[in-house]
Amino acid sequence: MSKIIDVKAREVLDSRGNPTVETEVILESGASGIAIVPSGASTGSKEALELRDKDERYMGKGVLKAVENVNNEIAKAVIGLDASSQTELDLTLIELDDTDNKSNLGANAILSVSMATARAMANELGIPLFAYLGGIFAKKLPVPLMNIINGGVHADNPLSIQEFMIVPYGAETFSDALRMGAETFHTLKSLLKENGFATCVGDEGGFAPNLESTEKAIEFILKAIEKAGYTPGEDIAIALDFAASEFYKDGIYTIDGNQYDKEGLLDFCIKLLENYPIISLEDPASEEDEEGWQILTEELSDRVQLVGDDLFVTNPKIFLEGIGKGMANAILIKLNQIGTLTETLETIAIAKQYGYNTIISHRSGETEDTFIAHLAVGTNAGQIKTGSLSRSERIAKYNELLRIEEYLGYGAMYASKEEFWPFLQ
C-alpha cells in the first residue's frame, strides 16, 4: 500500500518571485505528499547544486529542466519503490544522479521528491510529519532565532553582517517566545520610524534600515527589547549571522568599512561579546579560512555558540572533517544544501554524537512549505531560523509550530535556555 505510483513536478515561484520546484508523490493507498524546495542567496561553495535553465525565461532562473528530470528520469526510477523506506528512496536518487553535488539531476529536483515522499508516508499513516520523522520522542519545540534587522546580501543597506536576530530563550513555551518576538519586532519598527529610518523589509522579513554600523543595529534592538518590556540577556538574547564569506578577500575581512585580519576578527568578536548579550555567532569566519575558524573556536567556544553554515553545508562528510579540525560548536541545517532527507538526518545524528548544537534553517528564497517546522520538532533540534515576524512564507513556519505545540499538549517542551546552557555558566 505504500508503493509510489506517481510523481508529478511543476514550476512554481518562491518568495523572491524566482522559480522553484514543487513535487507531488502519490502512493498506492491514495495518500499523497507535496513539497516545495527553497533557494538561498548567500550560498556555500560546496552546497549541492540547484539546476537552473539559464535561458531567456525568468532571466535564466527557470527550473523546467529540473521539473522534467522529476517527471521523467526520477519518476521512472522511484515508481514502484516502497515509500516507507526513505533511505532506499534517497539512495536511489543519489545513485541515479551519480555526482558529488547532485549537478546532474539537480538538488532541487531530488530534494522535492525526497521531502514529498516523507510527507506522503506521514499522510498515509494519518500522523503529523514531525511524528513520522521522530516518533514518540519528538516533543521539543525549538527556540526561534528571529531575524529582525537584515544586512549583507539580504538587504540594500550599509550593514556588512547579514542577520541581526533576537532569541527569546527566556520564554516558558514556544507560543510565549513567538509573542515576545512579535512584540519586540513591532516595537523596533516604531523606534526606527521615530528616528527617521525606513521600515521596509528585506528578503527574510526583517527591517533593512540604513544604519552605519553593527553596534548601532544591536543598540536599536536592545532598546526595542527593553521598551517591549523584556530584559536583554535574561529574557531575550541576540544572535548574529556574519555570513563572513561575503566580505572576506585575500585574508582580510571588511566589516562596516573596517578591515580585519584573523586576529583582528577575533578581537572584534570579543568586543561584541563583552558589550552585548550575544549568544550565537553564525559563520563569523569565511568557509575558506580554516585557521580563522580554529582561532575563534579555540578562544570563544565556551562563551558563545559558533555556528557553521557555509562551513559545513549540511554535508556529513564535510561536517566530520570540520569536527576533526576543531571548527565551530554548532551546525546550521538546510535541507537544500545537501539535497535529501536521509543525508540531512545523518548530519543531524553526527551533530548529536559529537555534542554540536543543531539549528534547522530556512533559506532567503522561501515558500509556504512548512517542512522545516516539522523537521525541527521531529529531530528535537532545539533551535530554528525561519526569518522575521513578517512575510507569510516566514510566518507559515511559526504558525505550524504553534499547531504542533497545541497537538502535543502537555507533552510539548520548549527548548528555552537549556539549549544554550554551556554558554551561560
Curated annotation (Swiss-Prot):
Give the PROSITE patterns listed for this entry.
ENOLASE
Instruction: Tell me which UniProt keywords the record has, alphabetically.
Output: Cytoplasm, Glycolysis, Lyase, Magnesium, Metal-binding, Secreted
What SUPFAM superfamilies does this protein map onto? Enolase C-terminal domain-like, Enolase N-terminal domain-like
**Which pathway does the protein contribute to?**
Carbohydrate degradation; glycolysis; pyruvate from D-glyceraldehyde 3-phosphate: step 4/5
Its GO biological process terms?
Answer: glycolytic process
Pfam families, from UniProt?
Answer: Enolase_C (PF00113), Enolase_N (PF03952)
- Asked whether the UniProt record includes Metal-binding among its keywords, one would answer yes
Q: Name one GO molecular function term.
A: phosphopyruvate hydratase activity
The answer to keyword Ubl conjugation applying to this record is: no
Swiss-Prot/TrEMBL catalytic activity: (2R)-2-phosphoglycerate = phosphoenolpyruvate + H2O
Its Gene Ontology cellular component terms are:
cell surface; extracellular region; phosphopyruvate hydratase complex
Q: Which InterPro entries match?
A: Enolase, Enolase-like_C_sf, Enolase-like_N, Enolase_C, Enolase_CS, Enolase_N
Cofactor or coenzyme needed: Mg(2+)
Write down the superkingdom of origin. Answer: Bacteria
Q: Which residues are recorded as binding Mg(2+)?
A: 241, 282, 309
Enzyme Commission numbers on file: 4.2.1.11
UniProt cofactor note: Binds a second Mg(2+) ion via substrate during catalysis.
The record's subcellular locations are: Cytoplasm; Secreted; Cell surface
Residues annotated as catalytic: 204, 334
What is the role of the protein in this entry? Catalyzes the reversible conversion of 2-phosphoglycerate (2-PG) into phosphoenolpyruvate (PEP). It is essential for the degradation of carbohydrates via glycolysis.
Per the record, the similarity remark reads: Belongs to the enolase family.
- The protein's name in its UniProt record: Enolase
Q: Which organism is it from?
A: Hydrogenobaculum sp. (strain Y04AAS1)
